[in-house]
Amino acid sequence: EGQAQAGERPGPRLTFSADEDTALTLIPTQRLTPQTPALDSPAPQSPTLQRLQAELAEKRPGALKAFWKQVAKQGTPLVEPLDAERVLVTFLWRQQRPGDVRLLWPTPEVNTRRFEALAGSDVRYLSLPLRRDARVSYQLSADLPDLQQADRGTLRLALQAAARPDPLSRTPWLNSRALPRAEQASLVQLGGAPAETWDQPRKDVPRGKVERLGYSSQALANQRQLTLYTPPGYDPEGQRYPLLVLFDEDHYARDVPTPTILDNLIAAGRIRPTLAVIVGNVDASSRGRELPCNEAFADMLAHELLPWLQQRYALSEEPADRVLSGSSYGGLASGCIAYRYPERFGKVLSLSGSFWWGPDEQQPQWLVRQFAAGERLPLAFFLSSGLLEEPEADGILGSNRSLRAALQGKGYPLHYREFPGGHDYAAWSLELAEGLQALLPAH
């Protein structure tokens, strides 16, 4: 059935549902053969590979062995100067036998490009120009069938099924270490990327209390998981606390360690002590129904969940102390709910928000047009999207730029950032920390 992947447009997904005692058998009906790399591969851009190519052409003894020895020593990808603002990043895979190799990367067009084969060798490679401050997670997929004619959804499913971290990389994405092997990733973090990150535990930093529980909604007649965070030293008698409401609990309590980020920011005096509730999805299909400007879901948050939290915690009564946040569809939901209930939620922290969304093809960028046409509401925004995301009007980067223009035209308080990355939790973990500092500063 069609499902959305991480807030992207729907693509195919295989879902099984059966009683406990039912046996399911998969019977292949088509065999896809591995793709043999083209013999007329273009000359490599990488100076390192150009030198290797020349040495192989000269039949220099031991050239290939020495190359792989050096790669193992320094790790991958190769990073070589390109110009004042960019470097050439070359991903490598070692394979002599036929079979497609691809990069699983948080921007769609790169996933459609195969690794090239260096003639006369077992070197497969893909070179990309990147900004000198890029930070992007990635995986590699090998031994793939011929996917040249596959649509985007089929291609992504095939890449995910074969995905693995880069075996030659020395930089794992640390937040993925506890995940299943197929979900672990490597990290490109170039020299100009921010040195300070907030998503790793720090010594001697007090930790807040984290609790996971089920929450039932009468209005929606469903149940979901919540992760609740209370800051270190929480005193219900002493003060009233800001509230962060964050969507996609399965990712923002795991891929992005939100409690750790909050612990570190609070301890460093960057933000006020803040409570957080990370709201889970009912199931895989509910995300695409509830988060894209769903009035019933917004009503549940405003009339059920918020009062439920207020009864249990010492929360500020000020809408300006309540932040809605999420990535992709979660960023869209944050904007839509604040638009519907500005008297309850006063701030929006959007990470690569899917503002291209419309209820149908005739109404693209629906939320952008609402803010552009309506009166200014008592809201403040932090918008962040990646330079590797789609710049077109119906893409993430393009629609975020459209929303920026609409908000600026109305005079909304706005922090706007374009980060050198893609649709990627490795980037969003940094951007979440930036947004919290912008919207809930300690001073």
Predicted feature residues:
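Exposed low-complexity, polar/acidic, P/S/T/G-rich flexible segments that act as propeptides
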Residues: D21-P42
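N-terminal accessory segment at the very beginning of proteins
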Residues: G7-G11, P34-T36, V101
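Non-catalytic cap/lid and distal C-terminal segments of serine-dependent acyl enzymes
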Residues: L39-N111, L118-H443
